[in-house]
Amino acid sequence: MARFQEFYKEKVVPGLIEKFGYKSVMEVPRITKITLNMGLGEAIADKKVIENAVGDLTKIAGQKPVVTKARKAIAGFKIRQGYPIGAMVTLRGRAMYEFLDRFVTVALPRVRDFRGVSGRAFDGRGNYNIGVKEQIIFPEIDYDKIDALRGLNISITTTAKTDDEAKALLASFKFPFRN
């Protein structure tokens, strides 16, 4: 069992039951999945960009991402339907908890001028989104071997009904909120 998974069962669940007064353990919000998404608009001109991004995401997530394709053509962006324009990977279970552990304890402290993550990036239904400006904050990425700095979006999906519940859940996982 992953370290954060054990931590969730032993510390987070009892803490949230006490805070929100849940009657059942199954009511306690939990993280269902973490989605990592890289939008690659520059892939239209250079096909190697997709390969490099897929390689980076594979190292970060520990599993192979799926290449996302354009759903419809947009002439203004010179995109045709079916063009590869991004890569995404969905983590669940053990891999999800291990990624969360690495993200909170190793990657976030490596961000330059880091003052904490925004406490306002919830969507109203208990899900949290965070944007990372450069992939080199992850220790798996070798700075000398990357071709370009790329950002990615990390979407954390929870079973929480409200943003307050989701924020309490993530805060109990030692998420460094600034507000």
From Swiss-Prot:
One of its GO terms (biological process) is translation. The keyword Amino-acid biosynthesis does not apply. SUPFAM superfamilies: RL5-like. Coiled coil: none annotated. PROSITE patterns: RIBOSOMAL_L5. InterPro entries: Ribosomal_uL5 (IPR002132), Ribosomal_uL5_bac-type (IPR020930), Ribosomal_uL5_C (IPR031309), Ribosomal_uL5_CS (IPR020929), Ribosomal_uL5_dom_sf (IPR022803), Ribosomal_uL5_N (IPR031310). GO terms for cellular component: ribonucleoprotein complex; ribosome. One of its GO terms (molecular function) is tRNA binding. It comes from the Bacteria. Keywords: Ribonucleoprotein, Ribosomal protein, RNA-binding, rRNA-binding, tRNA-binding. Part of the 50S ribosomal subunit; part of the 5S rRNA/L5/L18/L25 subcomplex. Contacts the 5S rRNA and the P site tRNA. Forms a bridge to the 30S subunit in the 70S ribosome. Belongs to the universal ribosomal protein uL5 family. HAMAP family: Ribosomal_uL5_B (MF_01333_B). This is one of the proteins that bind and probably mediate the attachment of the 5S RNA into the large ribosomal subunit, where it forms part of the central protuberance. In the 70S ribosome it contacts protein S13 of the 30S subunit (bridge B1b), connecting the 2 subunits; this bridge is implicated in subunit movement. Contacts the P site tRNA; the 5S rRNA and some of its associated proteins might help stabilize positioning of ribosome-bound tRNAs. This is Large ribosomal subunit protein uL5.
